[in-house]
Amino acid sequence: MIFIDACFKKPTPYTPIWMMRQAGRYLPEYMEVRKQAGDFLSLCKDYKKASEVSLQPIDILDVDAAIIFSDILVVPLEMGMNLRFEKGEGPVFGNPISTLEDLEKLDDQNAHKKLNYVYDALKLTREKLSQNKALIGFCGSPWTIATYMIEGSGSKNYAKCKKMLYQNPELLHKILNKLTQVLKLYLEEQIKAGANAIQIFDSWASALEYDKFFEFSFNYMLEISNFIKSKYPNIPVILFPKGISGYLDRIDGNFDVFGVDWSTPLDLARDKLSHKYTLQGNMEPCRLYDKNAIKEGVEKILKTMQNKAHIFNLGHGILPDIPVENAKYFIKLVQESSAK
């Protein structure tokens, strides 16, 4: 698999490419299946439909890897939190965590056993996927998941989380530790079900100041990665902490690929990290609105990463109103322009 070879810094015939949120709303085929499922969470829980939408970008765009269709918040859902998706405001937890008693009500022993719909979707997708295409499993970082569990929804300033961080750091560490243990088992089951690689999404990394990022986020991601790498050395682990271009000097540990977001200068990440890790990224997602902007972005990134281990991706998820034709153009352009 070209994608796995690139993760491990092996030579590849061209630069492999996939897109975050590639199974998503910009595809009419996805919207059709989502409509059949009824709502977003029902789609996540219907393993046949989740597998179908995971495979759509392979069939339509010919990307080099599929990522399983799911959501980072199915983990706290199966730990016993009350999750719903509100139109216009995204995920909402009806019972956010603010005390140790709230945390102790959550089931960390059996949560990973209740996520069979994810493992079944992985098994089915791996069966249907061509042998040369990789299948990526994933989870959210403990910190990013915790922000939703504590805030009760998405947040502009993470005030409840940060209040806990400064007033009661022991409680926040207990929440993060509990999540970390569940996520280790969850990812292990994903690997057993057929995932060829794992990505940990730390979408809200940039909400933390420098030292606190390493204490409350990065160290927990490393604990998960160390667990995976010790048991499954042939499974690459990708970390994607978004928005931390100022923190790159301290990024170190046992993982394989570092995801670079679009706000981080790629040459900066290359100079600081490419001797240790394959870099993944980092085209500005809005470039996909315009073919000239796509061409300019692709050329610049390929030039920056010339002779370095690289997986092409967007620097965040593809947006819902991107024309499919532009996405196809983008994928093909990367694969053809980077061909050795």
From Swiss-Prot:
Keyword terms of this UniProt record: Cytoplasm, Decarboxylase, Lyase, Porphyrin biosynthesis
Pathway as given in its UniProt record: Porphyrin-containing compound metabolism; protoporphyrin-IX biosynthesis; coproporphyrinogen-III from 5-aminolevulinate: step 4/4
Record localization: Cytoplasm
One GO location term (cellular component): cytosol
Enzyme class: lyase
MF terms in GO: uroporphyrinogen decarboxylase activity
Assembly and binders: Homodimer.
Role description: Catalyzes the decarboxylation of four acetate groups of uroporphyrinogen-III to yield coproporphyrinogen-III.
Family: Belongs to the uroporphyrinogen decarboxylase family.
Name listed for the protein in its UniProt record: Uroporphyrinogen decarboxylase
Gene name, Swiss-Prot/TrEMBL: hemE
